[in-house]
Amino acid sequence: MTGYQTKITRIRAQLASEGAAGALLSTPDNIFYATGFSSVMDGWHLVEPIAAVFVPTATASPVVLILPEASVISPIVSERGGHPVHFDRLATFDMLNFCETARAEDAHLALPDDLLAELGDVMEQVEGQCEPDIVQSIAACLSRHVSKEEQILFDDLRVAARVEALTRQASGDALDVMFAARAVKTADELDTLRESGQVADAIMSYTISQLGVGKSWGEVEKQVAHFMINHDVDPLPGSPMLFGGAYDLVFRPDLFRTPVS
Protein backbone atom coordinates (compact mmCIF):
# COMPACT_ATOMS: atom_id res chain seq x y z
CA MET A 1 0.00 0.00 0.00
CA THR A 2 1.41 3.39 -1.02
CA GLY A 3 1.62 6.37 1.31
CA TYR A 4 -1.31 7.95 -0.53
CA GLN A 5 -3.45 4.83 -0.17
CA THR A 6 -2.58 4.65 3.52
CA LYS A 7 -3.78 8.23 4.03
CA ILE A 8 -7.05 7.66 2.19
CA THR A 9 -7.61 4.44 4.13
CA ARG A 10 -7.09 6.26 7.44
CA ILE A 11 -9.48 9.07 6.45
CA ARG A 12 -12.10 6.53 5.39
CA ALA A 13 -11.74 4.62 8.65
CA GLN A 14 -12.27 7.79 10.67
CA LEU A 15 -15.26 8.76 8.52
CA ALA A 16 -16.80 5.35 9.06
CA SER A 17 -16.36 5.67 12.82
CA GLU A 18 -18.27 8.96 12.68
CA GLY A 19 -21.03 7.49 10.53
CA ALA A 20 -20.34 9.98 7.73
CA ALA A 21 -20.61 9.25 4.01
CA GLY A 22 -17.52 11.24 3.10
CA ALA A 23 -15.34 14.30 3.62
CA LEU A 24 -15.18 17.41 1.48
CA LEU A 25 -11.77 19.01 2.03
CA SER A 26 -11.10 22.50 0.66
CA THR A 27 -8.22 23.82 2.78
CA PRO A 28 -4.78 23.65 1.10
CA ASP A 29 -3.11 21.48 3.77
CA ASN A 30 -5.82 18.83 3.71
CA ILE A 31 -6.03 18.82 -0.09
CA PHE A 32 -2.28 18.29 -0.29
CA TYR A 33 -2.42 15.59 2.37
CA ALA A 34 -5.15 13.62 0.60
CA THR A 35 -4.01 14.06 -3.01
CA GLY A 36 -0.58 15.69 -3.26
CA PHE A 37 -2.18 18.61 -5.17
CA SER A 38 -1.10 22.16 -4.43
CA SER A 39 -1.69 25.35 -6.37
CA VAL A 40 0.59 28.31 -6.92
CA MET A 41 -2.38 30.42 -5.82
CA ASP A 42 -2.24 28.90 -2.33
CA GLY A 43 0.52 31.40 -1.59
CA TRP A 44 -1.84 34.28 -2.20
CA HIS A 45 -3.94 33.40 0.87
CA LEU A 46 -7.23 34.00 -0.92
CA VAL A 47 -10.32 34.05 1.26
CA GLU A 48 -12.13 31.66 -1.08
CA PRO A 49 -11.08 28.06 -1.75
CA ILE A 50 -9.52 27.39 -5.13
CA ALA A 51 -9.63 23.59 -5.05
CA ALA A 52 -11.23 20.75 -3.11
CA VAL A 53 -11.27 16.98 -2.82
CA PHE A 54 -14.14 14.65 -2.04
CA VAL A 55 -13.09 11.54 -0.12
CA PRO A 56 -16.03 9.11 0.07
CA THR A 57 -16.23 6.62 2.90
CA ALA A 58 -17.20 3.83 0.50
CA THR A 59 -14.12 2.27 -1.08
CA ALA A 60 -16.07 1.60 -4.29
CA SER A 61 -16.64 5.34 -4.81
CA PRO A 62 -13.97 7.55 -6.42
CA VAL A 63 -11.82 10.18 -4.76
CA VAL A 64 -12.70 13.32 -6.73
CA LEU A 65 -10.29 16.25 -7.09
CA ILE A 66 -12.12 19.51 -7.79
CA LEU A 67 -10.07 22.25 -9.44
CA PRO A 68 -10.37 25.14 -11.93
CA GLU A 69 -10.86 23.99 -15.50
CA ALA A 70 -7.78 25.98 -16.47
CA SER A 71 -5.71 23.93 -13.98
CA VAL A 72 -6.54 20.50 -15.42
CA ILE A 73 -3.00 20.31 -16.78
CA SER A 74 -1.56 20.83 -13.28
CA PRO A 75 -1.49 17.12 -12.29
CA ILE A 76 0.55 16.33 -15.41
CA VAL A 77 3.04 19.12 -14.77
CA SER A 78 3.32 18.14 -11.12
CA GLU A 79 3.95 14.48 -11.92
CA ARG A 80 6.60 15.40 -14.50
CA GLY A 81 8.28 17.40 -11.76
CA GLY A 82 8.40 14.35 -9.52
CA HIS A 83 5.33 15.17 -7.43
CA PRO A 84 2.43 12.95 -8.52
CA VAL A 85 -1.14 13.99 -7.76
CA HIS A 86 -3.47 11.18 -6.70
CA PHE A 87 -7.17 11.05 -7.57
CA ASP A 88 -9.72 8.81 -9.24
CA ARG A 89 -11.86 11.42 -10.95
CA LEU A 90 -11.81 15.17 -11.61
CA ALA A 91 -14.51 17.83 -11.41
CA THR A 92 -14.03 21.38 -12.69
CA PHE A 93 -15.30 24.91 -12.24
CA ASP A 94 -14.73 28.27 -13.86
CA MET A 95 -12.57 30.94 -12.25
CA LEU A 96 -13.60 34.12 -14.03
CA ASN A 97 -10.86 35.70 -16.09
CA PHE A 98 -8.21 33.26 -14.83
CA CYS A 99 -9.89 30.57 -16.91
CA GLU A 100 -10.62 33.03 -19.71
CA THR A 101 -6.92 33.87 -19.89
CA ALA A 102 -5.85 30.25 -19.71
CA ARG A 103 -8.20 29.30 -22.55
CA ALA A 104 -6.76 31.96 -24.86
CA GLU A 105 -4.42 30.80 -27.59
CA ASP A 106 -0.76 31.45 -26.81
CA ALA A 107 1.04 32.16 -30.08
CA HIS A 108 4.41 31.53 -28.43
CA LEU A 109 3.55 28.20 -26.81
CA ALA A 110 3.36 24.89 -28.62
CA LEU A 111 2.56 21.94 -26.38
CA PRO A 112 4.49 18.76 -27.26
CA ASP A 113 2.49 15.85 -28.62
CA ASP A 114 3.19 13.63 -25.61
CA LEU A 115 1.84 16.30 -23.26
CA LEU A 116 -1.28 16.72 -25.39
CA ALA A 117 -1.80 12.95 -25.26
CA GLU A 118 -1.49 12.95 -21.46
CA LEU A 119 -3.87 15.90 -21.25
CA GLY A 120 -6.39 13.94 -23.29
CA ASP A 121 -6.14 11.05 -20.83
CA VAL A 122 -6.67 13.40 -17.89
CA MET A 123 -9.67 15.05 -19.55
CA GLU A 124 -11.32 11.63 -19.82
CA GLN A 125 -11.30 11.49 -16.02
CA VAL A 126 -13.39 14.67 -15.73
CA GLU A 127 -16.95 14.01 -14.59
CA GLY A 128 -19.92 16.31 -15.04
CA GLN A 129 -19.74 19.75 -16.62
CA CYS A 130 -17.63 22.78 -15.78
CA GLU A 131 -19.64 24.60 -13.10
CA PRO A 132 -19.73 28.41 -12.67
CA ASP A 133 -17.91 28.33 -9.32
CA ILE A 134 -16.34 25.93 -6.83
CA VAL A 135 -19.38 25.72 -4.54
CA GLN A 136 -21.61 24.64 -7.40
CA SER A 137 -18.96 22.15 -8.54
CA ILE A 138 -18.78 20.69 -5.02
CA ALA A 139 -22.57 20.48 -4.82
CA ALA A 140 -22.79 18.77 -8.21
CA CYS A 141 -20.03 16.33 -7.26
CA LEU A 142 -21.76 15.36 -4.02
CA SER A 143 -25.10 14.92 -5.79
CA ARG A 144 -23.48 12.41 -8.14
CA HIS A 145 -22.04 10.25 -5.36
CA VAL A 146 -24.18 10.61 -2.22
CA SER A 147 -27.73 11.49 -1.28
CA LYS A 148 -28.44 14.81 0.43
CA GLU A 149 -29.57 12.93 3.56
CA GLU A 150 -26.11 11.36 4.01
CA GLN A 151 -23.77 13.40 6.18
CA ILE A 152 -20.68 14.91 4.57
CA LEU A 153 -17.99 16.38 6.82
CA PHE A 154 -16.36 19.64 5.71
CA ASP A 155 -13.06 21.14 6.84
CA ASP A 156 -14.36 24.63 5.96
CA LEU A 157 -17.74 25.31 7.53
CA ARG A 158 -18.31 28.35 5.30
CA VAL A 159 -18.19 26.01 2.31
CA ALA A 160 -20.49 23.61 4.17
CA ALA A 161 -23.00 26.41 4.79
CA ARG A 162 -23.00 27.45 1.13
CA VAL A 163 -23.43 23.89 -0.12
CA GLU A 164 -26.15 23.17 2.44
CA ALA A 165 -28.02 26.31 1.41
CA LEU A 166 -27.76 25.28 -2.23
CA THR A 167 -28.74 21.61 -2.01
CA ARG A 168 -29.77 20.93 1.64
CA GLN A 169 -26.85 18.52 1.92
CA ALA A 170 -26.47 17.16 5.46
CA SER A 171 -23.11 18.36 6.77
CA GLY A 172 -20.77 18.24 9.75
CA ASP A 173 -17.29 19.25 10.89
CA ALA A 174 -14.31 17.25 9.58
CA LEU A 175 -11.85 18.67 12.13
CA ASP A 176 -11.72 15.64 14.45
CA VAL A 177 -11.63 13.18 11.55
CA MET A 178 -8.69 14.89 9.88
CA PHE A 179 -6.77 15.34 13.14
CA ALA A 180 -7.17 11.65 13.93
CA ALA A 181 -6.22 10.57 10.41
CA ARG A 182 -3.15 12.80 10.22
CA ALA A 183 -1.89 12.09 13.75
CA VAL A 184 -0.27 8.82 12.66
CA LYS A 185 2.43 9.49 10.08
CA THR A 186 3.02 7.29 7.06
CA ALA A 187 6.46 5.88 6.30
CA ASP A 188 6.90 8.47 3.54
CA GLU A 189 6.00 11.30 5.91
CA LEU A 190 8.49 10.07 8.49
CA ASP A 191 11.24 9.93 5.86
CA THR A 192 10.42 13.48 4.79
CA LEU A 193 10.45 14.71 8.39
CA ARG A 194 13.84 13.13 9.05
CA GLU A 195 15.36 14.63 5.90
CA SER A 196 13.78 18.08 6.15
CA GLY A 197 14.45 18.26 9.89
CA GLN A 198 18.19 18.02 9.35
CA VAL A 199 18.06 20.76 6.71
CA ALA A 200 15.90 22.96 8.95
CA ASP A 201 18.34 22.51 11.85
CA ALA A 202 21.23 23.58 9.62
CA ILE A 203 19.33 26.68 8.48
CA MET A 204 18.43 27.65 12.05
CA SER A 205 22.02 27.18 13.19
CA TYR A 206 23.25 29.40 10.36
CA THR A 207 20.60 32.01 11.17
CA ILE A 208 21.71 32.16 14.80
CA SER A 209 25.33 32.53 13.68
CA GLN A 210 24.42 35.63 11.66
CA LEU A 211 22.76 37.49 14.53
CA GLY A 212 24.77 40.26 16.10
CA VAL A 213 24.78 43.78 17.49
CA GLY A 214 24.17 46.40 14.82
CA LYS A 215 22.83 43.99 12.21
CA SER A 216 19.40 44.62 10.75
CA TRP A 217 16.98 41.75 10.31
CA GLY A 218 16.91 42.53 6.59
CA GLU A 219 20.65 41.83 6.36
CA VAL A 220 20.23 38.57 8.23
CA GLU A 221 17.37 37.53 5.95
CA LYS A 222 19.47 38.12 2.83
CA GLN A 223 22.34 36.04 4.20
CA VAL A 224 20.03 33.24 5.28
CA ALA A 225 18.30 33.30 1.88
CA HIS A 226 21.67 32.81 0.16
CA PHE A 227 22.45 29.94 2.53
CA MET A 228 19.11 28.31 1.76
CA ILE A 229 19.58 28.64 -2.00
CA ASN A 230 23.04 27.08 -1.74
CA HIS A 231 21.43 24.11 0.02
CA ASP A 232 18.66 23.70 -2.59
CA VAL A 233 15.97 25.21 -0.37
CA ASP A 234 13.62 27.80 -1.90
CA PRO A 235 13.47 30.80 0.47
CA LEU A 236 10.31 32.14 -1.18
CA PRO A 237 7.00 30.54 -2.11
CA GLY A 238 6.57 30.33 -5.85
CA SER A 239 3.45 32.46 -6.11
CA PRO A 240 4.91 35.90 -5.25
CA MET A 241 7.65 35.35 -7.81
CA LEU A 242 5.05 35.40 -10.58
CA PHE A 243 4.70 39.11 -10.03
CA GLY A 244 8.26 39.98 -9.08
CA GLY A 245 7.99 39.65 -5.31
CA ALA A 246 5.66 39.60 -2.35
CA TYR A 247 4.39 43.18 -2.43
CA ASP A 248 1.99 42.65 0.45
CA LEU A 249 1.02 46.31 0.80
CA VAL A 250 0.57 46.89 -2.93
CA PHE A 251 -0.48 43.79 -4.80
CA ARG A 252 -3.65 41.87 -4.18
CA PRO A 253 -4.80 39.21 -6.64
CA ASP A 254 -8.24 40.76 -7.09
CA LEU A 255 -7.83 40.68 -10.86
CA PHE A 256 -8.69 36.99 -10.71
CA ARG A 257 -12.05 37.81 -9.15
CA THR A 258 -13.03 40.39 -11.78
CA PRO A 259 -15.75 39.23 -14.19
CA VAL A 260 -14.92 39.38 -17.88
CA SER A 261 -17.46 41.18 -20.02
Label the model's feature ranges.
Residues I203-Y206, Q210, D234, G245:
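Amphipathic, soluble alpha-helical interaction motifs
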Residues G197-I208, W217-A225:
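Active-site pocket-lining segments that scaffold enzyme catalytic pockets across diverse folds
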Residues M1-V199:
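A composition/biophysics-driven feature that prefers long, compositionally simple stretches
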Residues L15, L211, M228:
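Hydrophobic pocket-lining residues that define ligand/cofactor binding sites across diverse proteins
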Residues V146, L211, V260-S261:
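Hydrophobic beta-strand core residues of beta-sandwich domains
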Residues A34-W44, L157-A161, A165, G172-V184, ...:
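Short catalytic-site patches enriched in acidic/histidine residues
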Residues A183, D191, S205, V213-G214:
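Glycine- and small hydrophobic-enriched segments that form the cores of compact globular domains
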Residues S61-P62, E69-A70, S209-G214, G218:
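Electropositive, surface-exposed helix/loop patches at the edges of structured domains
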